[in-house]
Amino acid sequence: MTVPCAALVLALGLAFGQSSQGNDEESEYSGQSITEEENSEDETTRSALATVTTEALAENVNSTHTNDTSNQVEFILMVAIPLAALLILLFMVLIATYFKSKRPKQEPSSQGSQSALQTHELGGETLKVPIFEEDTPSVMEIEMEELDKWMNSMNRNADYECLPTLKEEKEPNPSPSDNES
């Protein structure tokens, strides 16, 4: 940053120096005489400083161009890529909703649904027949069947575990201590 500032100060100094050199009449009145050698040396110095200043300004412009390029890359990374990702996501959602609405809606299956119709296939035709209450078991009937199964399994397992069965518990069996007395 100091090189561009120094180049700018040098360029301004040269500009003011040339404007004061343009007044030859003032230099004659001041009592100073400029010889041609001093004048040519002065011009050589000015041209050398001008080329150095131009090179410094060119470097400054090149570094600004590099900064602009990096700013463009940052802009692309920070704005353009997330925006493109958002557009792709939106496009995918729209396609999914389009295909979902285009697909024919299927009838829910009779199992687990509250549908009052049951499908039967006769030949090549499918008929929808209403489900009547006597055709479906109630919750209580299902629970009773499960309880019966459990009780039967308990009776079978009782023989192996040395637990008294229901029949043994119901029979009045005198205890051995009662027989001795």
UniProtKB/Swiss-Prot annotation:
Q: Where in the sequence does UniProt note compositional bias of the Polar residues kind?
A: 107-118
Q: Which residues cross the membrane?
A: 75-95
Task: Name the membrane topology term.
Answer: Single-pass membrane protein
Q: From the UniProt record, list the coiled-coil ranges.
A: none
Region described as Disordered: 19-47, 103-122, 161-181
Q: Which residues lie on this side of the membrane: Extracellular?
A: 23-74
Cellular compartment(s) = Membrane
Phosphotyrosine occurs at 160
Q: Which InterPro entries match?
A: TMEM154, TMEM154-like
A Pfam family cross-referenced in the UniProt record is TMEM154
Q: Which residues lie on this side of the membrane: Cytoplasmic?
A: 96-181
What are the record keywords, sorted? Membrane, Phosphoprotein, Signal, Transmembrane, Transmembrane helix
Q: Which residues form the signal peptide?
A: 1-22
**Assigned GO CC terms:** membrane
- Modified positions (Phosphoserine) are 177
Protein name per UniProt:
Transmembrane protein 154
